[in-house]
């Protein structure tokens, strides 16, 4: 219904319309959905991909909304489940790094760690904004059942 209502020249929901090669025809739509969802403390879920046997196409289209911050995408067929989990779950290295940021920030903002607000974790400065971003990645990883492969060790004075 949506594709027809905006008169988009395409028969495939979610794919770029023929002749539109200058960007993403859906960027404004996806960002509008995402901002509305976040404004109302709701999850942003991308719509269906009807070509149920085209798993690579599903991943490509899902990757677009995942990159923007969507929480997931409709799954119409069991063959799309693993693809959705792969696309919307963080990579192991990102999950581990998020957990390290959280542990390091907790330590360095504590009295034992010097009660500081911004600190270095290796070559990276971390602060409250870093902590908030890490919370998002960490929560997604935990929801996906990920286990950490690295641990934070406070420096020995």
Where are these regions (language model features)?
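Expand to "…catalyze enediolate/carbanion chemistry for C-C bond making/breaking, isomerization
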Residues: 1-157
């Amino acid at each position: 219904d949506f594709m027809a209502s905006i008169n988009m020249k395409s028969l495939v929901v979610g794919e770029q319309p023929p002749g539109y090669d200058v960007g993403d025809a859906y960027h404004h739509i996806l960002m509008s959905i995402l901002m509305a969802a976040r404004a109302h403390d709701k999850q942003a879920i991308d719509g269906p991909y009807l070509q149920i046997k085209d798993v690579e196409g599903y991943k490509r289209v899902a990757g677009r909304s995942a990159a923007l911050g969507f929480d997931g995408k409709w799954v119409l067929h069991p063959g799309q489940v693993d693809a959705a989990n792969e696309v919307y779950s963080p990579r192991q290295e990102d999950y581990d790094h998020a957990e390290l940021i959280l542990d390091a920030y907790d330590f360095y903002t504590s009295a034992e760690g010097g009660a500081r607000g911004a600190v270095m974790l290796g070559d990276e400065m971390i602060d409250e904004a870093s902590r908030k971003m890490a919370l998002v990645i960490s929560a997604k990883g935990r929801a996906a059942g990920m286990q950490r492969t690295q641990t934070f060790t406070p420096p020995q004075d």
